[in-house]
């Protein structure tokens, strides 16, 4: 499903302003939606589906003022990560899956887990670590 005027619908989840600016420039002319937290992503993903391209970071919260958290079974507060966003993506029907996902995290362990889950769900996924110059 392409957006207006044949452009791609792109959803980006990252807590880094530099990355958001870079992706905005890279995808100029396309419909780009920027989310900074898991909660913003989950809402935008469900409301805007289907997406042509989704960009995901793993480590979220260290660069935003109010990071998303949850409490685990032992009562410890944990930060939401891109892996939580993957669960949202994998839960939708086949017709609502994104055409492609790019994991841009520099966290190799987190990125690999995300790529594995998305690939098992049948979503074309690549890992393209994005570091600041």
Residue ranges and their predicted role:
Residues 1-133:
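Catalytic phosphate/metal-binding cores of nucleic-acid and nucleotide-processing enzymes, i.e., regions
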């Amino acid at each position: 499903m392409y957006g207006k005027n044949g452009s791609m619908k792109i959803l980006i989840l990252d807590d880094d302003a530099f990355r958001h600016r870079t992706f905005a420039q890279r995808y100029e002319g396309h419909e780009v939606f920027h989310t900074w937290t898991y909660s913003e992503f989950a809402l935008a993903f469900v409301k805007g589906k289907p997406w042509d391209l989704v960009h995901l970071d793993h480590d979220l919260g260290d660069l935003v003022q109010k990071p998303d958290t949850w409490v685990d079974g032992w009562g410890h507060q944990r930060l939401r990560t891109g892996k939580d966003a993957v669960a949202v993506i994998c839960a939708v029907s086949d017709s609502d899956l994104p055409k492609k996902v790019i994991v841009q995290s520099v966290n190799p362990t987190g990125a690999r887990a995300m790529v594995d889950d998305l690939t098992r769900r049948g979503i074309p996924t690549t890992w393209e670590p994005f570091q600041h110059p």
